[in-house]
């Protein structure tokens, strides 16, 4: 039987997937900026006792390569997390479907699958947020 901890774990896993997606988007933006900016220019001193200055221009391959590698790793992590999330979702839905009380099924679905707050659930069901919280706590105490 699924316990409250697994339902909470499912909610946490949903948030983790969202965070990884945000990191992927941020990395993709960084890569796009590197590609857009193209070559970088730097000035170095050297020759003749260090009084001559040379301008060096080139594409920042090391940084670009690191970002690309990071992006691939994050995408692999996301795929793994999404698979785990789908497997856990099936378990959670089976557990909720096994609950006899229709109102409790609705409350559990809104709270753990739809990730709604107690206040949002209360508005839909017609209770205040503390009643929703107490109903969930009482359900898991049984």
Question: What does each of the following model-derived ranges do?
Answer:
Residues 1-95:
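N-terminal interaction/assembly modules
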Residues 96-100, 131:
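Short coil/turn residues that cap or connect secondary-structure elements
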Residues 136-140:
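DNA major-groove recognition helix of helix-turn-helix
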Residues 120-125:
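Short alpha-helical "recognition helix" segments of helix-turn-helix
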Residues 100-114:
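Short amphipathic alpha helix immediately N-terminal
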């Amino acid at each position: 039987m699924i316990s409250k901890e697994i339902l909470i774990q499912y909610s946490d896993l949903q948030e983790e997937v969202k965070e990884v997606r945000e990191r992927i988007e941020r990395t993709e933006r960084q890569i796009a900026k590197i590609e857009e900016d193209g070559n970088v220019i730097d000035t170095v001193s050297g020759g003749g006792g260090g009084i001559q200055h040379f301008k060096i221009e080139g594409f920042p391959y090391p940084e670009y390569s690191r970002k690309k590698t990071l992006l691939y790793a994050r995408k692999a992590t996301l795929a793994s997390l999404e698979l785990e999330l789908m497997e856990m979702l099936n378990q959670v839905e089976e557990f909720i479907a096994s609950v006899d009380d229709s109102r409790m099924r609705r409350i559990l679905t809104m709270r753990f699958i739809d990730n709604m707050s107690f206040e949002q659930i209360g508005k839909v069901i017609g209770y205040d947020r503390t009643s929703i919280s107490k109903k969930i706590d009482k359900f898991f105490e049984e």
